[in-house]
Amino acid sequence: MDHDTLLGFLGLAEKLKCNTRHSWTSSGRHESVAEHVYRLMVFAWLVRDEFPELDMDRVMELALFHDMGEAVTGDIPAFEKTGEDEKTEGEAQEEIAGLLPGPRGEKLREIFREVRE
């Protein structure tokens, strides 16, 4: 992967640090999408031995990328999400996966498909 592609993708991921969610932290401020993803990753790691039947590497991938589309769309709370929002989110995910060449982009498309299921 060339440097421009790598840095471009990381720049997009960085937006998740600035995009806030509808939920609040225990300190009373809005949680960023990146903070939400981090905590979910920690949770998945902590319980990985409790679910030996699961492919925990896949669970970690799903946790890592499940809200990546929000770097483009912003947070849309699940309880407010419409069919049009889901379409927009899918388009954003395709745009994001398209930033990565070859197998890496295909892998991300697979992850996004599974997240939507």
Regions found by a protein language model. Name each.
Residues M1-E117:
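Alpha-helical, largely C-terminal catalytic domains
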